[in-house]
Amino acid sequence: MKKLLAMILWLQLDRLSGELKVEQNPLFLSMQEGKNYTIYCNYSTTSDRLYWYRQDPGKSLESLFVLLSNGAVKQEGRLMASLDTKARLSTLHITAAVHDLSATYFCAVD
């Protein structure tokens, strides 16, 4: 089995009304082809809007998903994202990982 690499970074942003924290877990993930993985994104605001991005080495950010409401679920290929605004949590599921999914993944809220 080939080993894949997904780097997961967390973003911390400031707002005028206070500090907004966005944290992803795990921060680093070494994937194996064919396995399933989940990336968690916790945030401190009451925002109903969450974004997932992907960045390949040497390239600009690519928008994957925009989740606009509690319970929202979106899927594209082997990636599926969901949003639970009550828990202030979003997840990005990677199903049957393949080499093309090796990238850096980001979540963000506004």
Curated annotation (Swiss-Prot):
Gene3D superfamilies in the cross-refs: Immunoglobulins
UniProt protein name: T cell receptor alpha variable 39
Keyword presence, Cell membrane: yes
Subunit and interaction comment: Alpha-beta TR is a heterodimer composed of an alpha and beta chain; disulfide-linked. The alpha-beta TR is associated with the transmembrane signaling CD3 coreceptor proteins to form the TR-CD3 (TcR or TCR). The assembly of alpha-beta TR heterodimers with CD3 occurs in the endoplasmic reticulum where a single alpha-beta TR heterodimer associates with one CD3D-CD3E heterodimer, one CD3G-CD3E heterodimer and one CD247 homodimer forming a stable octameric structure. CD3D-CD3E and CD3G-CD3E heterodimers preferentially associate with TR alpha and TR beta chains, respectively.
Role played: V region of the variable domain of T cell receptor (TR) alpha chain that participates in the antigen recognition. Alpha-beta T cell receptors are antigen specific receptors which are essential to the immune response and are present on the cell surface of T lymphocytes. Recognize peptide-major histocompatibility (MH) (pMH) complexes that are displayed by antigen presenting cells (APC), a prerequisite for efficient T cell adaptive immunity against pathogens.
Subcellular location: Cell membrane
Secretion signal, residue range per the UniProt entry: 1-18
Transport among keywords: no
Ig-like domain mapped to chain residues: 19-110
Disulfide bridge positions per record: 41-107
PANTHER family on file: IG-LIKE DOMAIN-CONTAINING PROTEIN-RELATED (PTHR19339:SF10), T CELL RECEPTOR ALPHA VARIABLE 39 (PTHR19339)
Superkingdom of the source species: Eukaryota
Glycosylation sites: 36, 42
GO CC terms of this entry: T cell receptor complex
A GO BP annotation: response to bacterium
Record Pfam families: V-set
InterPro entries linked to this entry: Ig-like_dom, Ig-like_dom_sf, Ig-like_fold, Ig_V-set, TCR_alpha_variable
Record keywords: Adaptive immunity, Cell membrane, Disulfide bond, Glycoprotein, Immunity, Immunoglobulin domain, Membrane, Receptor, Signal, T cell receptor
